[in-house]
């Protein structure tokens, strides 16, 4: 314990660590998790005493200290004890943000991804009143995020249709994000969740300046629909830290990512997949309509494709903008698509991948330019070539 008193929460969601760090007045919080990545890619998420993730420069400094085995000057003594009971405190914090019993009558399938959501998702949804069916419901560190959860919706989509459920929810490994599936088996991503939840808050005056914080990945259809209803959008780079920083700067109450990270300042300082899932279930139940109908009336989602190109050289991956042939290819794509399309290329923050996103009104144009740009990136920056996202 290095001179500190350590509370071990056991298996729990990342947002539970952050929330309890703040509400239990702890000096900090640590979460060991692969997040949404493959099981071998475990890492550490570090939270300050206010529940915020450490700023990137502090994370990098800590990482360098660990690599160099810098002595930390720890004191002797300290203690460690299990506090699994605190997970119930976190659960009650979530339920206090909901209207009791609103989930009643809804049949919901939860894909718990063999991960952290197995610790409390069933309890939460049952207390909320939903009839729950579970996929991948036991913790298994060898299978977490493998062909299941928010990064692989196929099994959930089939289960929702086969079992006649109203909706399905898929979490990632540490439950800080979620995606949904409607009763027809169609996926509902973070853009639609953010639009629908934002609409609810807007109607009851809970959205200052009618502003939502989005990332570069947000769909063109979402952007145009929100602005047509008089809303304001604040764009950030990909990453929940960037989203929350913009929310702090602008006073926005809600922000999120297409991947299913949604942040609500009334509840939390990071994305919370369980809160997002419960809020989506509540707004669907209160509407008296299907999630499919709500999504269908929200906005036309432009065809969008994300292709991952494996680039093992980190310098080449980070310096892709310096490649003139790749820049010329992007310019040609943007000229061909005009204002109804765009290209976004960025290096992954967690994997040796260059992510190539193409979006346009016509799906055929998306497929064509995705293939051409991903192949060009692989040829110019390194092999092997493109992988489907």
Feature names for model-found ranges:
Residues 167, 204-389:
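Phosphate-binding and adjacent anionic-ligand microenvironments
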Residues 37-38, 113-119, 175-176, 218-220, ...:
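Gly/Ser/Thr-rich loops at beta-strand to alpha-helix junctions
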Residues 9, 15, 60-92, 96-98, ...:
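Proline/glycine-rich low-complexity loops and linkers
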Residues 18, 63, 95, 119-126, ...:
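Predominant activation on well-ordered alpha-helical scaffold segments within soluble catalytic domains
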Residues 17, 30, 36, 94, ...:
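Buried hydrophobic positions in well-ordered alpha/beta secondary-structure cores of metabolic enzymes
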Residues 1, 40-49, 119-122, 173-193, ...:
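Short Gly/Thr/Asp-enriched flexible loops that form oxyanion-binding sites at enzyme active sites
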Residues 1-41, 123-181:
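N-terminal small/polar loop signature for handling phosphorylated ligands or for N-terminal nucleophile
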Residues 42-163:
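Gly/Ser/Thr-enriched, mixed-charge loops and adjacent short helices
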């Amino acid at each position: 314990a290095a001179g500190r008193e350590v509370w071990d929460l056991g298996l729990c969601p990342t947002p539970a660590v952050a929330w309890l760090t703040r509400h239990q007045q702890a000096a900090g919080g640590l979460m060991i998790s692969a997040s949404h990545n493959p099981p071998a890619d475990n890492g550490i998420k570090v939270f300050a005493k206010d529940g915020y993730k450490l700023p990137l420069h502090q994370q990098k400094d800590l990482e360098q200290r660990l690599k160099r085995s810098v002595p930390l000057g720890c004191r002797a003594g300290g203690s460690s004890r299990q506090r699994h009971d605190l997970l119930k405190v976190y659960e009650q914090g979530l339920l206090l943000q909901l209207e009791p019993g609103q989930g009643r009558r809804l049949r919901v399938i939860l894909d718990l991804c063999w991960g952290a959501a197995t610790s409390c998702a069933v309890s939460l949804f049952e207390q909320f009143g939903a009839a729950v069916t579970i996929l991948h419901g036991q913790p298994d560190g060898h299978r977490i995020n493998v062909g299941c959860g928010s990064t692989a919706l196929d099994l959930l989509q089939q289960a929702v249709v086969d079992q006649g459920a109203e909706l399905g929810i898929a979490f990632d490994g540490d439950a800080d994000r979620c995606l949904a599936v409607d009763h027809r088996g169609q996926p509902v991503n973070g853009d639609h969740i953010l639009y629908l939840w934002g609409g609810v808050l807007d109607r009851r005056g809970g959205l200052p300046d009618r502003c939502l914080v989005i990332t570069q990945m947000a769909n063109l259809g979402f952007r145009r629909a929100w602005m047509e209803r008089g809303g304001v959008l604040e764009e950030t780079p990909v990453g929940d830290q960037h989203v929350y920083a913009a929310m702090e700067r602008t006073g926005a109450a809600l922000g999120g990512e297409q991947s299913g990270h949604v942040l609500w300042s009334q509840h939390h300082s990071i994305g919370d997949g369980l809160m997002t899932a419960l809020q989506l279930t509540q707004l669907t139940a209160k509407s008296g309509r299907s999630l499919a109908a709500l999504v269908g009336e929200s906005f036309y989602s432009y065809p969008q494709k994300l292709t991952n190109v494996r680039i093992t050289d980190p310098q080449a991956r980070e310096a892709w903008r310096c490649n003139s042939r790749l820049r010329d290819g992007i310019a040609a794509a943007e000229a061909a698509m005009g204002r109804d399309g765009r290209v976004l290329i960025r290096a992954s923050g967690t994997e040796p991948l260059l992510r190539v996103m193409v979006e346009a009104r016509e799906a055929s144009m998306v497929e064509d330019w995705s293939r051409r740009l991903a192949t060009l990136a692989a040829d110019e920056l390194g092999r092997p070539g493109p992988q489907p996202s």
